[in-house]
């Protein structure tokens, strides 16, 4: 499973349970599952993590999977509570 698919599935689970996750928690899960940034470094909950969320959202929209894209948009949040996909 690639990073985008992992994000999609995690977002689906979060939405099914009525919860969300902040970017730092997501970075920890990505690292724990062995995923790396495009620069082959661990995720830190910064720019690389936000880029992955946004890229996953765009990939799902372009694939016509709008429900999945909406899940990604709503599931992951910045520390201030705003949505991380923007």
Describe each PLM feature range.
Residues 15-32, 36:
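Short, charged amphipathic recognition helices of the HTH superfamily
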Residues 2-21:
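Positively charged, polyanion-binding regions of nucleic-acid-associated proteins
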Residues 31-67:
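Short, positively charged loop/turn segments that connect secondary-structure elements
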Residues 24, 40, 70-71:
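Residue-level detector of family-conserved "landmark" positions at structurally sensitive sites
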Residues 63-86:
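Phospho-regulated, low-complexity intrinsically disordered regions of nuclear gene-regulatory
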Residues 1-4, 27-29:
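Short amphipathic alpha-helical segments, especially helix-boundary/capping motifs
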Residues 15, 27, 54-57, 61, ...:
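Residue-level detector of alpha-helical secondary structure
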